[in-house]
Amino acid sequence: MASSDETIFDLPPYIRVFKDGRVERLHSSPYVPPSLNDPETGVSWKDVPISSKVSARIYLPKISDQQENEEKLPIFVYFHGAGFCLESAFRSFFHTFIKHFVSEAKAIGVSVEYRLAPEHPLPAAYEDCWEALQWVASHVRLDNSSLKRSMDKDPWIINYGDFDRLYLGGDSPGGNIVHNVLLRAGKEKLNGGVKILGAIQYYPYFLIRTSSKQSDYMENDYRCYWKLAYPNAPGGTDNPMINPTVENAPDLAGYGCSRLLISMVADETRDITLLFIEALKKSGWKGQLDVADFEAEFFDLFQTQTEVGKNMIRRLTSFIK
């Protein structure tokens, strides 16, 4: 084997990293271009730059003539999952889900395109998602006249966004990003004094040690993604960003939102999620906690044409008020 083909990380069928720094992403869904008035849902979407490092796909549900002058829409900022190292806000796997979520919730969607590991190891994704959230918040109290002065602002958010109903969401590592963003939002102010009303953590990615044999596999594949994404993490897999129950972890009572929906599915991660929920309850956090315990698998949520997937989306969107 040539030295250039020597691998340092190989997790088929998803990703392979070579000693010379090359990365092969072996499994990615197709890119979906921007579009207006999707024939299936009526949703429109476009891609916008936020900075030289961060961009986002913004979604607008179908707006009737009557709704043009009615109350504004909730804002849903989403951080996608896939191991911190795979997929994209612009690819069909997460795009299709968000399109249907936005249509069902009647909300503006902002799906963040953050930098991926291992080329950009953590905490890059955390910083990118915080920057994207601050950009969204910077639109508060603006009107269309602001667009002439600020070329980096988006008219959909200005015209239709209700900043009293700002929500975050994320799946798996995206749910972990939500966790870390909420902790930061509890300490630092968002632009314009905007507050996060609620957040959804679907299948949140944590590495909390359990006594369950069912969770033994966490020592292997599940932990590999963290080691790939943050190889120099202080404390390794006991870093507070991935294990919120370690001794030096930030106080969960400082979560910067008023409402939280945590979703579990029927697999080995359920025990870990239950431990996190227990820690959150014991912390004294004053918000409203809702738990969705699905008798389904992780990927069922993203099968948007099935009844199971549709029902899961309805359950999650019912949280957006």
UniProtKB/Swiss-Prot annotation:
Pfam families: Abhydrolase_3. Its EC number is 4.-.-.-. One of its GO terms (biological process) is alkaloid metabolic process. Pathway: Alkaloid biosynthesis. A motif (Involved in the stabilization of the negatively charged intermediate by the formation of the oxyanion hole) lies at residues 80-82. GO terms for molecular function: hydrolase activity; lyase activity. It catalyses: dihydroprecondylocarpine acetate + NADPH = (+)-vincadifformine + acetate + NADP(+). The active site is at S172, D267. Coiled coil: none annotated. It is an enzyme of class 4 (lyase). Keywords: Alkaloid metabolism, Lyase. SUPFAM superfamilies: alpha/beta-Hydrolases (SSF53474). Component of the seco-iridoid and derivatives monoterpenoid indole alkaloids (MIAs, e.g. vincadifformine) biosynthesis pathway. Catalyzes the conversion of O-acetylstemmadenine (OAS) to vincadifformine. May also trigger the formation of additional unknown MIAs. Belongs to the 'GDXG' lipolytic enzyme family. This is Hydrolase 3. It comes from Catharanthus roseus. The gene is HL3.
